[in-house]
Amino acid sequence: MRRIAIVFFLCILLGTHLSAQTPKNHSPADIYHEIQKLNFLGTALYIAAHPDDENTRLISYLSNNVHARTGYLSMTRGDGGQNLIGPELRELLGVLRTQELLAARRVDGGEQMFTRAVDFGYSKNPKETLEIWDKDMILGDVVTAIRKFKPDVIVNRFDHRSPGTTHGHHTSSAMLSVEAFDLANDPTAFSDRLENTETWQPKRLFFNTSWWFYGSQEKFEKADKSRLLNVDIGTYYPMLGMSNNEIASLASSQHLCQGFGRLSSRGSEEEYLELLKGNMPKNKENLFEGINTTWTRVEGGDKIGAILNKVEADFNFKDPSVHLADLVKAYQLLQDIGDEHWKELKSKELKAIIEEVAGLHLEAFTTQGYSNPGESIVINLEAVNRSNKKIKLESVSINGETKLNEPIDLKDNQLFRKELKITIPKSADYTGPYWLMEKGTLGTYSVTNMDLIGKPETPRAFKATFNLNLEGVSIPIDKTVSYKYGRPDKGEIYQPFEIVPKATSKLQDKVIIFSDDTPKQIPVTIKSHKDNVSGSVSLKVGQNWILDSPSQSFSIEKKGDEQTLIFTLTPPSSENETSLTSVVHIDGEDISKEMVTIAYDHVPTQTVLMPSEAKVVRLNIHKAGENIGYIMGAGDDVPTSLEQIGYTVHTINPADISEGSLQKYDAIVLGIRAYNVVNELNFKQKYILDYAKQGGTVIVQYNTAGRWANQFENIAPYELEISRDRVTNENSEVKIIAKDNDLVNYPNKITPDDFQGWVQERGLYFPDKWSSEFTPILEMQDEGESATKGSLLVAPYGEGHYIYTGLSFFRELPAGVPGAYKLFSNMLSIGKDNLTKKEQVKG
């Protein structure tokens, strides 16, 4: 039995890597595990700031060992992070990280919630964070989440008493949780949000502490632990064939875009919880001690508990279907209790168990991935009763409207199939993340539908309800309509079904820089999402920009095909920046959307409709040099940005670097974190520095502190120590302290105005110590901190130059910040006032 449990449980976990929509097959061990959860009426809520902040060990322990309903409330969706597996950043990264969180919860058994807070990047303190987030709005979201989820215990990941010692988002999440703990039960607090919920008072609030928060293991061992609970989260689950930490490691490993793939850990391990509010449990190994978590918690629950506790005690692992009659009876009694909260939760759990013990397979799917409002689609229904119990399918409804009303006996292992043709309402919303439907602010998403706030994702467009009769009791079971197809290399795949426009358009470049008056061709690609689509496309642009044509026609025969149209755009003669929007006109509808698909094996494919627009900038910029060699680090879009202002950029494979191989380039640029992630640089650094010594320019962008120190003794030709210094306020004052240096004079004059309009931050991981050969160019600081001069350093080396910069060009250039382009051009141009054009670089 244990071997069977292992196989089935691993299949469930690994299945999330193929498609999160795939129906799960439940072993008797899985069903028994769910019955244990069914018989526990207690709830825990974990609160932190970002995807991957959560302690999956504790979430898994609460869900799988305690059997509590366990949720994770993440303040943000992680939009401000970086992406180690693909190109998605900002809003699109938030969509990906949302799905990775949901994948993690499918593994550890938790549920997922969010507030409307945006991950706007690193913040040094909660004061800044809460100002940008709009504290009252996000506090209201936390209060509402508590009222809806109704946790008995809340666990904070971070300490609310230590502002400035960690990410401001981290501390803010804990501060909001502490405040919301009491406000959730105050009817005068956020009373406008009580329409669909009610006040709630959690019993206990904990801080998930560890030795790390004390500074060292030695200090933690000596600390007063009188207010600490400790639980062994290394427990082994014989029924599942895995330990708690193995499950937790698999859950954490869903955060692939953040590089959280990790090895499993095994063995006993303690987790500590500091009581912040509420009474101290007598048993310091039980968060729920003294809280009624049995069926007697709800009026009328004693009869239900008597039935379900007996099912648990006498569970038949060889034939779980023998419990069907008792489970149906418990379901029937459950419908009569007055506590709507527990009725809804436990009815959902109980229906899933009934479906599993009866061997029922119910699904509704389409064989097309998407369609349009007003179009017809076919929904395929399948129902199989794989037991000898009498089960009747009485009817099937789609979104509440009955579409099949012919009672059918589901005979043992006989497949029932039916096709339903339905029409998508013309008023149907397009598929997409609800939090991106409207333009938000720097710190918050704009969501007008209050019922959606907190949900991890937008509910899918179609839901099929199978109305069944089991043991004489009517039981409705809902199934989301999915898209199902097969691939020879992957087999059966389930993905979400999408509703999309008839056509969308895409501007090839999101930022278009005009460095002079020369017109540029603007490609616009139209993609059809139905057969035989024709219409026109127009571009909208600001004043003083001239288009060669107001609109152009297109015609596309096949769904999924594309057609590219070319417009010519002439910039104004003076510096200017504006937006450029493409609009598709079809059948009286104007569509200014680009369809972005996010597809990875470990999460369901996501369709996001983003504004089809670009930023166009007329920039009076000068440059010297033509050919740039770029050594990619962790990944950035700087090369594409440099090509926008006329440079030819060649990506260099570090393995190909040899003596003299770099001499054909006018400058060598190393991408972000190159010395952290490109091990070959350890052996190629001599050639890079020799290139500078012989007259070249080497530009090194930021690397994180600590990692390279033991690997590279000569990241620079002179002494240079990288710190964790950073300036997170993108609007902080910048002083030019080396006013005569070429970096701020040639070929573009740099003034404080060139630091206007920067995004997210000034920079990060600035050096704090350097030799006298280096000249610091800029001075800046965050509020309340000492000024730092290490953001941009330049040193002559032999006949050339070495530049180290922690300025966030990897963010500013793709965002089209004019001053960032001018400054980077100066960096590339240094020492080239008498440049002799180098021979054409091949490739």
What do the PLM-derived regions correspond to, one by one?
Residues 1-5:
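Positively charged n-region of N-terminal signal peptides that target proteins for export
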Residues 6, 20-45, 125-129, 135-362:
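Metal-dependent de-N-acetylase/amidase catalytic core
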Residues 7-16:
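Bacterial N-terminal signal peptides
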Residues 21-148, 171, 178-182:
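Active-site rim/loop-helix segments in enzyme catalytic domains that contact anionic ligands
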Residues 673-755:
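A glycine-rich, often tryptophan-bearing local segment used as a flexible ligand/cofactor-contacting loop or short
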